[in-house]
Amino acid sequence: MHLNKIRGKNMKKSHILGIIICIILIVGFFISFDSTFLDNPKMMSKSKNNIRNAENLTNISKNSNNLKFLWAYQLQNADIDEIANSNFTLIVIDYSKDGTENGKYSEEEIEKLKKAGKIPIAYISIGEAEDYRFYWDNEWLKNPPKWLGDENPEWEGCYAVKYWHPEWKKIIFSYLDKIIQQGFCGVYLDKVDEFEYWAENGYDEDFTAKEMIKFIVEISNYCRNKTNNSFIIIPQNGERLLEYDKHGKLLNTVSGWAVEDLFYDGVEQKTEEEINERIKLLDKVKDSGKFVLVVDYVDDGTKTNENLKRVEDFINKSLDKGYVPYVAKSDRELDELNTWWLKLIN
């Protein structure tokens, strides 16, 4: 691993230092990924002091050796101090507290996370345009660019994009410039599964899948050329892309993979058929020596035994597969750092 393109005279020393810190954190992260993270009793005793009390907890230690690190996923109102003092190692947050340019985190705030030993990863949607982002032009509602598609009926203000168009790629690269400048150590790529949407709306899936693979590789090259070769790339969902990755270029490019709703759809269990169809692809990632992150929205926020058992079941199933779980609230808002469930892992 080495620094690339940091020779520019105008690059601030603090930015160069931030890149170096990212490299150190990421190298340490992958070293710990090859060890048993939860074997450290001090870490676990610390976590128990930071989470709420719960009664009748079932010990999940039979699978805890499969857990190499902890990760968290919060896209709204993230508190930098709270995250810095948490036991999560890999942190996925938005580049902005509220999604807008005015709310973006400062370089100093991201630096604070890194100094606390956290690896900050920036969320970015590459398959949809969001009307609250810095790049949005309200004129598009009257005169949409040729790459802008329909609004997502489940997420107001989010619009499908033909991500293979140069105009959209230019927007994403400018977005990545902001993320890199802030000092993030990687990106979390959402809506990579948009290739399936366009395959259902007039395009051949072989084309849409290969164009998404190409885009992810381009994003990786862009970020790593501007920072370092260890810059983390994590796609979310869309693991069927691996079926089109005939020469392994995508798998060689990504640092790991993340999925939502693997074992549960909200608080409802998925069928074995649904689960196994995804696991056979996710295991390709795991078997290549890379991590698999899983976030299921299983926590309904109550202290009932039903909720507890569901959360335990999700954790156990994830650990049994060698995946890294994060228990999220069932409202899917991702507006808080959910920590109480960590007490189940001891």
Swiss-Prot record:
InterPro entries: Aldolase_TIM (IPR013785), GH114_TIM-barrel (IPR004352), Glycoside_hydrolase_SF (IPR017853), TM1410-rel (IPR016062), TM1410_Glycdase (IPR016063). Signal peptide: none annotated. The keyword Membrane applies. Keywords: Membrane, Transmembrane, Transmembrane helix. This is Uncharacterized protein MJ1477. It comes from Methanocaldococcus jannaschii (strain ATCC 43067 / DSM 2661 / JAL-1 / JCM 10045 / NBRC 100440). It holds the Pfam family Glyco_hydro_114. It comes from the Archaea. GO terms for cellular component: membrane. It is found in: Membrane. The lineage of its organism: Archaea, Methanobacteriati, Methanobacteriota, Methanomada group, Methanococci. It is a single-pass membrane protein.
